[in-house]
From Swiss-Prot:
GO cellular component, one term: membrane
Topology in the lipid bilayer: Single-pass membrane protein
Keyword presence, tRNA-binding: no
Coiled-coil zones: none
Protein name: Protein HflK
Superkingdom per UniProt: Bacteria
Alphabetical list of Gene3D superfamilies matching this protein: Band 7 domain
Membrane-spanning residues: 15-35
Family note: Belongs to the band 7/mec-2 family. HflK subfamily.
Location(s) in or outside the cell: Membrane
InterPro entries given in the database record: Band7/mec-2_domain (IPR050710), Band_7 (IPR001107), Band_7/SPFH_dom_sf (IPR036013), HflK (IPR010201)
Organism per entry: Borreliella burgdorferi (strain ATCC 35210 / DSM 4680 / CIP 102532 / B31) (Borrelia burgdorferi)
Tagged with keyword Transmembrane: yes
Length: 311
């Protein structure tokens, strides 16, 4: 006969083994984790940093190890004042306080803006401050308030948005490095900037119209400039070239005359009488060849009656 007690003991042993294996499997499975391609995992052992893991399947030791997964390759962003649309700003004075900032000329401007950042050091991001996202938000608001306070409302709306956003980015990165938060601010954007309704908004609209008119006149002036100036420059260059040609011609003629004069002078110095006679003969020949009705009159002749005038 079967020993019931022995069978029970064997069954109990197998059951214990099965339960133990199941528990071990559950514990192992519970401590297996997957790190995504855009993430890194921080593993703490007894509360201290033990290792940092890249993407893949990993296992941690139960009870004594703890893991934190951080998205290090994703650009994250924090938005400010996006509850307000431009129509809300014009129609409602009860705008979101987060979007209202005092400018350097003591006006109030409503701004919709955002900060984009990436995590550079997962451990510093997770453990250097208690609430990193709130800290980043406070740093961003402080930097934006300071930069807005350095500009007038019209500079912010029309001219200097890029300067402000670059200044906020630089200021944030400097403060973040001092606090060792382990992030890099990638970009700061001002999506919308409008004054509240009232006289300031009306003045802003007037300025915008004036700026549009100014740009219109500038473009018209540039168009006329581009049409007229090249033509004038061409005419000026033509006159300059003609003057240069005339100058060269006069210089060359003067040099030629100088060479002729020097040759005559040399001949005269060698044979003055012969040279005088030759010059006289050449001059008379030129006169007689080119003139009509030449009359030769004796200088001692008196009471000369010009026959050519007698009719």
């Amino acid at each position: 006969m079967f020993d019931i007690k022995q069978i029970f003991n064997k069954t109990y042993e197998y059951l214990i083994i099965i339960i133990t294996l199941i528990l071990i499997s559950i514990i192992v499975i519970a401590n297996i984790f997957i790190v995504g391609p855009s993430e890194e995992a921080i593993v703490l052992r007894l509360g201290k940093l033990n290792r940092t893991l890249d993407s893949g399947i990993h296992v941690k030791i139960p009870l004594i190890e703890e893991k934190f997964i951080v998205p290090v390759k994703i650009v994250q962003e924090i938005k400010f004042g996006f509850l307000i649309s431009p129509s809300d700003i014009r129609e409602n004075d009860n705008a979101n306080d987060e979007s209202r900032i005092i400018t350097g000329d003591l006006n109030i401007i409503n701004i919709e803006w955002l900060v984009q950042y990436k995590i550079r050091d997962p451990y510093s991001f997770k453990f250097k401050v208690e609430d990193p996202e709130t800290t980043i938000k406070d740093i961003a608001k402080s930097s934006m308030n300071r930069l807005i306070g350095d500009n007038t409302i019209f500079e912010i709306i029309n001219d200097n948005r890029v300067g402000i956003t670059e200044g906020v980015k630089s200021s944030m990165n400097e403060i973040i490095d001092n606090y060792n938060l382990g992030i890099d601010v990638v970009q700061v954007q001002i999506r919308n900037a409008l004054p509240p309704k009232g006289k300031v908004y009306e003045a802003f609209e007037d300025v915008n119209i004036a700026i549009q008119d100014k740009n219109k006149y500038i473009n018209e002036g540039r168009k006329e400039f581009n049409q007229i100036v090249p033509k004038i420059k061409g005419e000026a260059l033509k006159v300059i070239e003609e003057a240069r040609g005339y100058k060269e011609s006069r210089i060359n003629n003067a040099l030629a005359d100088t060479e002729i004069f020097n040759a005559i002078l040399d001949a005269y110095l060698k044979n003055p009488d012969i040279t005088k006679e030759r010059l006289y003969n050449e001059t008379m020949k030129e006169i007689l060849e080119n003139k009509d009705n030449i009359e030769l009159i004796d200088k001692n002749f008196k009471n000369f009656l010009p026959f050519k005038e007698v009719k």
